[in-house]
Amino acid sequence: MIIGVCGFIGSGKNTVADYLVREHCFVPVSFASVLKDTCASLFGWDREMLEGRSEESRIQREIIDEFWSERLGIPNFSPRYGLQYIGTDIMRKHFHPDIWVIASERVLMRYRDVVISDVRFPNEMAMIRRNGGKIWMVDRERPSWYDVALNAPEQMPEFYPHIHESEYV
């Protein structure tokens, strides 16, 4: 069984996936795993930092990598920016829109029960359904910051240099 979990930021997608892994022996698969492996190797970033869910790893992903920022001439080049830019702006837009979906599909075919907790795009949902999977939408009471975050990128884009359109709430 394949279960794709989607929902807004902070809704509990990983909590649902962790439960399925712990209690029902599901294998966790991520659309972003191959991208994170690639960026960790290319830029010399710690793989655990790219994957980590701790507050510390979230903060580290936002810190500008001065070495790469200077060498590439890209101000504000942080791990988060690098992941988004390479993942979406380069690979999805200029190589193949389904590159991460295809890479993940190849992985999930090896297992019987799989949970994917980072479902964000329609092509990801389509692949899950095409392989007989289900999409679970995690819906809980929206946090107090939700409405502010929903409109913030349109109101003050200059203050959000690391937010890519795929990350808007």
Regions found by a protein language model. Give the residues of each.
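ATP-dependent small-molecule kinase phosphotransfer cores
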Residues: 33-112
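Walker A/P-loop
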Residues: 14
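Hydrophobic anchor at the beta1->P-loop junction of P-loop NTPases
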Residues: 5, 116
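Extreme N-terminal starter segment of soluble prokaryotic enzymes
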Residues: 1-3
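Post-Walker A helix-loop "phosphate-sensing" segment adjacent to the P-loop in P-loop NTPases
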Residues: 22-29
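Small-molecule kinase domains that catalyze NTP-dependent phosphoryl transfer to phosphate-bearing small molecules
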Residues: 6-9, 98, 102-103, 123-130, ...
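Short, well-ordered beta-to-alpha junction loops that form the rim of enzyme active sites
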Residues: 118-121
